[in-house]
Amino acid sequence: MTTLFISDLHLDPARPAITELFLEFLRTQVPGSDALYILGDLFEAWIGDDTPSTAADAVAVALHAVADSGVPVFFMAGNRDFLVGETYAQRAGFRILPDPTVIDLYGHTTLLMHGDLLCTDDTAYQAFRAQTRDPVFQAQFLAQPLAARVAFAQQARAASQARHAELKQGDQSRFETVTDVSPAEVEATFVRYGLDRLIHGHTHRPAIHTLQAGGHTCTRIVLGDWYEQGSVLRVDADGASLEQLAL
């Protein structure tokens, strides 16, 4: 049997082909699996479960069908969709997991994260993350009219794009450092949890890394994004493999 992991789909009405690829994946590749884990950024943006979206409705129906077939579906919030709540979770039939989460994966204890917590060199983002993950901030934000939430999300996205563009125009090595995980934080995370395998997304740099942490050989598996193709990690009792899904 196999457990599937995906992240960083960034589903958006502006990219319907990716949504269709995901729906096809749910119909044809997920049935019969042991579980499906979505480790954040399922959606490009999420400003509340009350936001009208035909695409999100279709995704909810498809995910619920997977769950109804006997394949449990788990969702961990990313930096784009951290406001996904229990209302949508019930519609989609998935269980929301905290970040980080430890699971038993065929006898191998494994740490799951979205991955943004590992990017500690990006201090500006970490400050923004701390603010927006605060329950008081979220309650106040969700209480605002939909139009105000849309405006805030657009402003935040524009600011993020401008910052990334500025970084790209500067020192390329600095851009790569800021947008990737901190090696020191990765090592500290392995030591903190006392585990030797970590699965995460966020950086859009799919790979399977082997490293030393706390005197142990550890494995860090990075999930791929769904911008120009699909990406899935398949894990079974014999190992793990990253695969691309063609449009």
UniProtKB/Swiss-Prot annotation:
User: What are the required cofactors?
Assistant: Mn(2+)
| E.C. number(s) listed in UniProt | 3.6.1.54
> Which parts of the chain are coiled coil?
none
Protein's pathway: Glycolipid biosynthesis; lipid IV(A) biosynthesis; lipid IV(A) from (3R)-3-hydroxytetradecanoyl-[acyl-carrier-protein] and UDP-N-acetyl-alpha-D-glucosamine: step 4/6
Q: Which EC class is this protein assigned?
A: hydrolase
The entry's substrate-binding residues are 79-80, 122, 160, 171, 174, 202
Q: Where in the cell is it found?
A: Cell inner membrane
User: Gene that codes for this?
Assistant: lpxH
Q: Which residues bind Mn(2+) 1?
A: 8, 10, 41, 204
Keyword terms: Cell inner membrane, Cell membrane, Hydrolase, Lipid A biosynthesis, Lipid biosynthesis, Lipid metabolism, Manganese, Membrane, Metal-binding
Q: Which GO terms describe its cellular component?
A: cytoplasm; extrinsic component of plasma membrane
Task: Enumerate the SUPFAM superfamilies for this protein.
Answer: Metallo-dependent phosphatases (SSF56300)
Species annotation: Xanthomonas axonopodis pv. citri (strain 306)
Which Gene3D superfamilies does the protein's record reference?
3.60.21.10
Q: What is this protein called?
A: UDP-2,3-diacylglucosamine hydrolase
Q: Which domain of life is it from?
A: Bacteria
Q: Which CDD domains match?
A: MPP_YbbF-LpxH
The function of this protein is: Hydrolyzes the pyrophosphate bond of UDP-2,3-diacylglucosamine to yield 2,3-diacylglucosamine 1-phosphate (lipid X) and UMP by catalyzing the attack of water at the alpha-P atom. Involved in the biosynthesis of lipid A, a phosphorylated glycolipid that anchors the lipopolysaccharide to the outer membrane of the cell.
What the record notes about the co-factor is: Binds 2 Mn(2+) ions per subunit in a binuclear metal center.
Instruction: State the Pfam families in the record.
Output: Metallophos (PF00149)
Q: Name one GO molecular function term.
A: UDP-2,3-diacylglucosamine hydrolase activity
Q: Name one GO biological process term.
A: lipid A biosynthetic process
Q: InterPro entries given for it?
A: Calcineurin-like_PHP_ApaH, LpxH-like, Metallo-depent_PP-like, UDP-diacylglucosamine_Hdrlase
Binding-site list for Mn(2+) 2: 41, 79, 114, 202
